[in-house]
Amino acid sequence: MLESLQDRTEASYLVTELAKGILVEESEVVTKLGYIQRTVAHAKDSVAVEDAKQLRLLMLSPETAKYFTGSTFSALDGSYQSVAAKNTETQLNAVMSYVAASGLVFAHSFLESVLETLLRITRLCDIAPWLLLIRNKDVSISAIVETGLEPAIETKLNKFIVSLHKEGLLDKIDYLAKVLKCSISKSNIIDYTYDSERLNRIDTLRHQFSHHRKKDYRIETAQADITYVYRTALHFLDLVVHHYDLYGAQRPK
């Protein structure tokens, strides 16, 4: 039933596009994080000097001097410089944390998109497991009368597929595991080990970042997490490709 929805040729096109996309996206995100880290490191001293000058001007200005009354540092003896330097370091660390968090949020969203595409590939290769997923969902008699059994079931399936977009990262992985009906812990990706607990931690981090509940996230940690996220995308792509014995193909232009 609904075998007409299967299309291994389209699945092969998607495999090639997905593989290229994963490699390109990982390279761009990790490289940009590295460049930002280097840029901030080189600019740190110059920014510190500018911040110190700005603090001194504020302390000496008649309009703003009142805000520094009772301060333990002064614009006259140079003690303000250490305060300015500490503030600069705090602000730059916050900037780097923000950039690191943004990189992880982007990579997380990309992995979700990859999983959705992989789920689509599984439907193109074998619709049967998907029909099992919706076997307990009702199909109205009126829909069957109006369109016939197969179109009614296809409509129900399409609605179910649309609903998956709202599912979280780990739920999408669970659905992929159900469809593949095999272990998802091992693939042919070198130097990679599937770790559901680590993915859960990354998923929680993404949620915290989205709601501004976490601010101390280092670039080095982000680079490791982001690399793991993209390796995970390749891991699941490899599982799907080998499960259905797929080969990549170039989509005709």
What name fits each language-model region?
Residues 10, 29, 48, 54, ...:
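Low-complexity, compositionally biased segments
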Residues 62-200:
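Helix-loop junctions and short alpha-helical segments
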Residues 4-15, 22, 29, 41-48, ...:
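Intrinsic-disorder-associated interaction segments
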Residues 6, 37, 44, 158-161, ...:
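Residue-level detector of alpha-helical secondary structure
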Residues 1-31, 191-253:
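Polyanionic, low-complexity intrinsically disordered segments
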Residues 1-102:
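Charged alpha-helical initiation segments
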Residues 26, 33-36, 40-43, 50, ...:
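Short, surface-exposed, charged/polar-biased interaction segments
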